[in-house]
Amino acid sequence: YSDDEIEVVLAHELAHHVYGDIWKGLLFETGLIAGGFLLASFVLGAAVGLFGIRDAGDIAALPALLLGAGAVSLVAVPAAHAMSRAHERRADRFALTLTGNGPAFVSAMRRLAAQNMAEDEPSPLVQWLFHSHPPIRERIEAAQEFQRGTGSGTAMADRHDRDDTSVTKKGR
């Protein structure tokens, strides 16, 4: 990776710190886990007496628990991934605004995609179910729009220029 590519990737990661994405993700996923345990408790409570299940600790309750966990996962995992993709898009805009180096961003995305054997454009269903990051093609197109001045990074740059505690743009 070139120095410019490293700078863009580092700026992207810095955005996660600036916006508190790790803490937000931890809180969100903790809430999902707590909600999952609560739902599991209800499922096990409802399963007692059915199918010969004597109490929540009965091994016969395990299939009911697994079905409940699967149902929770069908909602919780895509929700967590959607939040993560939003954080990634925002971090991309931050990196582009901070560095102003769209070509290095595009180059870094292409190299990372090749290194990780990422699919350029997964189906919407696959993305919704399994991807915590936006598709590479979408990220590259957003960077190219940003470079043409049609991207959505300007408001972010203005907000950071007014914030005394933020990182300033390169070259200022």
Where are these regions (language model features)?
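Hydrophobic alpha-helical transmembrane segments
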Residues: 54-68
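Polar-ligand-bearing catalytic/cofactor-coordination segments
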Residues: 1-56, 75-172
